[in-house]
Amino acid sequence: MNTGAAHNMFFKTVEDSIEMRDRQKDGYSTEPLLPSTPTQRTFDYVLVAHKVDDETDQRAQRQRAFIQELEKKNISVTKLIHDDKVFFGLRAPHEAFEDYMYLLKVSDSCNWCGDARGGVTQATRIRIVHFILHETFINTGENLKELLMKDVFETMFCLHEKKKQKQLQKKWARWSALFTGQPVNDVKCYFGEKVALYYLWLGWYTKLLVPAAALGVVVFLYGLAFFNTNPLIKEVCQSSIIMCPRCDKTCGVWQLSDTCVYAKVSHLFDNEGTVAFAMFMAIWATLFLELWKRHRAKHVSQWKVYDWCEEEEELILKIVNDPNCKPKQFRHSYLQSTLVLILVTLMLMLIIGLAHALVVFRVVAAPLMSEVSWDFIKDHANTVAVMLGAVLHYVTIQIMTRVNRWVSLKLCDIEKTNSFAATERSFTVKMFTFQFFTLFSSLFYVAFFLGRINGHPGNYVRIAGWRLEECHPSGCLTDLFIQMAVIMLLKQTLNNIFEFTVPWLKSCLRRNTAKKLQRKCGHCYRKTCRDEQGRVEPCDICKLRDWLRNYHLADTDAFSLFNEFLEMVVQFSFTTIFVAAFPLAPLLALINNIFEIRLDAIKMARLERRLVPRKTNDIGVWTKVLEAIGVLAVIANGLVIGVSSDFVPRLVYRYRYGPCANGSTHADCMQGYINDTLSTASMSHQAVSHDFNRKQMMITDTGVNATQCSYRDYRSDEDYTLTSQFWLVLAVRFAFVILFEHVVVVCKFVAAWFVPNNPIRVKNDRLYDKLARLKEELREMKRDMSTDV
């Protein structure tokens, strides 16, 4: 018999085999393990503090005071010292969990949950102890949060359960499981319902992105199919029209045919298929949310948390912590609400001001790019300026994300909500609002204002002497596409790289710090780690080994899961709001999410400390946020198609001004469209000659001195007033927007009505469950009455 087979004879539990494999991997002793009986003495939480030798130091006194307060609540404290760190292992008394179970049973909203019927899991123990720790105050009135801020304690964390952690790593948190299903029930048991619902929602969102991504690719291929044969592209590429200079100082006239490539790219995203796709995505967003509600209802019903109330559980935890506690009453102050409203408004004005700064950057960058010696950049100065603006926008987003978080937390402190759940809802709404304005203010400018407020030759609009940007003759939609593509690609790619590499590098660097201790521990484990009853009771070295393993993982906090939700909801916004300008957005989101699920799983199960398991029955206020995004998507896409794209002007030209409008059947209906959208500026006009006063500005590449040039607008060639065609196009634009939004909104309401939130099976299961529960209560009452008699 080989050595490995002999060793396996001693493995009575999966935990033993896991431990032996880890010891062999780390170079520990491979001597056989003794059969083990799992210990019942688990640690619920660990506090870490810096070692203070001076007993009179304020930090040492506060540490002792806090530990004494915990001991008064019958929490067992195990103190271990390692180098300059002091570890406090905390274990709550069984009575606290019995009180919790009883209060759940008599609760109005929580009495139907699974915890009220079964035993207390380790996840529940952690949640209870976490609450007790944060609600424990020392004689100075400070709680744990304030002690952590004052460096009395360095950190706090709950411990990973090694056996369950390894099982999750094997089934879920690995790259080889990229295209397999998620063990949501196992995630729920280990990380709690809140984390499980995040992965359930993310998996559902990713699954429903498949049809959206497929249709987006079809729309893109539709534009690609007519890439070279479209008459509008031919008109641009074969044109000899001379266009007016794009800027004041360094730009000269140019030929429309110079932008042939730009016109082709514009047609990829600005075509007839875009309208149908935008309508589909608006209805898709509604169906996604309605089907998600059904999917959620099925799982929370199985988990027995359908009627769970977080605020009520918080009241129960308050009583468990202090039977004489008083509830934190609901309060409303008009002064506080007004102050918060003013501060939010000021913050939004600051964010919009940053968007204006980005506009100024592009206005200044475009003429500067036209001065460089590199011909490629010089010829595509406007496009390069847009791309640089998008990169700068991304940098602004990264900076403002931290500012927005700090401001949102401070505003929540001003509001003084009565529960953590209420604080979380308030923080979510504020943070998302700030992030939304940070991300989309610049995009809204590009979509709805770029090229519409810049004026015309002889009367240009300027900022500090710099002319505002103009739209390309083929339309402004490509600028919006470039802006979205750069931000979305940078945000998703770089964020995922940093999300994974930073915790991984920290874990690798810290892993060697406890190597000596772990090797020493490898020789004593399972032999000396036994109590008098023969149960496995880790020695101090084994405890330190486990605590250090968790201590060296990346830190987590109450808003760690919020960050993941925010990232995905922002992506959902990009996927739906301006999808008319970027049909490939759902495809990029789908590819990103396939990796995002495993990336987040690997982070949580391998690289980060264990999140505090939270019990809930929904994704919370995020549902309302997603519904608001769905409504905004209808409005934004209607405006993008009706106002930003050339769909309506092309439609008007086809049926009112084009060859087909006059009954001609020999020419293409769109022949002459590009020329129809251009107006002419003559140098004989005094105001125009003043704008183009440099001699070099009106000289073409062939050396010809141009006496007139064209620009994109519907204006008279004599007095530059708006033509009747402009007003007709504008009227049709508004009519289209109103019609589009009403049709899509009706479709959304029909879809929401047609798909009920709760499946019939869930309703029936809950009915039978409640009936069985009531019958059980009745039998217990009769049994108690007969016992009394």
Q: What is the predicted role of each segment?
A:
Residues 2-789:
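Intrinsically disordered cytosolic tails
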